[in-house]
């Protein structure tokens, strides 16, 4: 029999998902003055409110467990937030506004927020269901990787931000790591071929190996079910002890979809973060706005501010803005924002210092800076980003723009 939680006279806000988005929302709601909410935060993982961004630093042994919290859950509990961890929501009833948890208890809401995040995308490769094929999304994933003893052979699938951070962390722990990436260069969504080559050179110096332009065709398993070899497209069989999938994410939409809420790539929301159903909202990696999903922190933090404004009865509106990208690898400095692959109507400005491994590429359209790649010296990244955000006309400084703010010092609009 379901155990019913006690009702409250205040507006009952229930947040499904206790990752970064859900935990910060609960924490910031608690600190918002003149609000009359009771807040319940429900998480699938046993750890609540940790900084997922820092998982790669934890894996690389650059930080300790004590540096992982994003919010102070003890203070949140004292402040009245009811936190349920390790007990995922398995079903919901839109008419009764009731959630069913795996433990058997039920939670009733007045307003519901989906902050269910995403899961690692497991590619449809033969053998991918083996127990030593894993994602890199949770603290538990890091615990599995750090438990590897000796020098193990690890295959990382995906040369994006997450895959490269995982690869470097595993190399720092003494393992032999090979990264498979379908594109011909790393971080192909953030870098061009030339800057990516500089990055690859640096990562190879650190010990990471690469197989570019290909994905494994199969994983060979032993009688125990574990993957023992990666089959390359060339036919080569590469010995492996662990496979880490970092080839993208899949928004966690199962609960919303089963309830009949509009879902496309993710849970569809409007500018107020509201879903297709009254009193139900979504934010973070599980939501989709104007056919765009969100995997970086900056827009998600903006979504939290907008949603708190809306929940407080005021007018809030989420707008998509350019978001810069940085790689969290010690000793590697890169910055990317905006349009990096120019069209025929765009002008490109380059600066290269091969000896110092410095590279700059600026994309300009009709007097406006629209895209930036910096590798090596990234000190001007925030200034370039400000120029893009403010739509500052840079026509009168094009000759010196690539050298940075110190040479231009324009009046930012």
Predicted regions and their residues:
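Mid-to-C-terminal Rossmann-like scaffold of FAD/NAD(P)H-dependent oxidoreductases
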Residues: 2-12, 18, 31, 286-382
